[in-house]
Amino acid sequence: MKWGGRLFLALALVATGAAGQAGAATLSVGPGQAYALPSRAIAAARDGDTVAIAPGTYHDCAIVRRNRLTIEGTGPGVVLAGRSCAGKGILIIDANDVTVKDLTLQGAVVPDGNGSGIRAEGGGTLTVEGVRFVDNQDGILAAANPRAVLRVLGSRFVGNGSCANAGGCAHAIYAGPIGTLDVERSRFRDTREGHSIKSRAARTIVKDCTIADGPDGTSSYQIDVPNGGDVLIEGNRLEKGPKSQNRRNAIMIGEEGVTQPTKSLVVKDNTLVDDTGWPTVFVHNETATPAVLAGNVFKGGTVVPLVGPGTVR
């Protein structure tokens, strides 16, 4: 192809990309807006669109089937509550590379015990930023997909979790066998019975979070990584409260059998406050991979830094 032809092709490709970006629409939800309910805007959206939701409480749920969709609140007090779609949860993400921002998802309860603020069933990267999860069975439940990435940034989880279902417990975050779970700058409080974070991902990252039972939380583990995988837990503040359902361990790794390749287990620069009144193990490692613990600080009751292979420094 001659230079002129190459230049024409390059310009055409740039123009096509620009047109694709320009074609993305913002669908507005709220009183006096084009859509009265988030679910209607989400159903009408196309790939790459933004659904912008005005403050208010919406008794609504939705199934997301558009890739690269952004669902965001336009101000404080955007609440989706009291309804679950397909017997699963409030937002069911069956698409790739979706972003959910600045919402509250509240009160997801379904008969099987896994009512989720967000049920992640798609691929690519699901980004959850600035979202509050309140009184759900699962805050976020991510289905098995080895190529999926779940990123949770600057979000809050209050009163999530349940062990009411005979089939097992629900958790504030429960990631199935996905590629990566990355939770950063988020806060967990008053988790009920289940774990604050349970991850079967190939790679689990928890950084700069606060995970606290408080006086009334009844969580089991603060962080559970039952099948191994690479782990980085850094810069967090953990607190086990007096009503914890499992006072013996804060972080558990590999107790259900190691099915993920496990090359690196690093737990550093965290603080554990033990308010249980019982001796507590900070990290219980049941994999064959040595855990590296460094710079961790323990307050309150008696804390055993590590059970299982690894080093403490």
Can you name each region flagged by the protein language model?
Residues 26-60:
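Acidic Gly/Asp/Thr-rich repetitive segments characteristic of extracellular carbohydrate-active
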Residues 1-9:
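Bacterial N-terminal signal peptides that target proteins for export
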Residues 82-91, 111-120, 135-144, 164-175, ...:
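Extracellular beta-strand/beta-solenoid scaffold signature
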Residues 20-24:
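Boundary at the C-terminal end of the N-terminal hydrophobic targeting segment
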Residues 8-17:
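Bacterial N-terminal signal peptides
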Residues 68, 72-78, 96-107, 124-135, ...:
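Right-handed parallel beta-helix
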Residues 30, 54, 72, 81, ...:
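Residue-level detector of conserved, well-ordered beta-strand and adjacent loop positions
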Residues 47, 58-71, 79-101, 106-124, ...:
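Extracellular beta-strand-rich solenoid/capping regions of secreted or surface-exposed proteins
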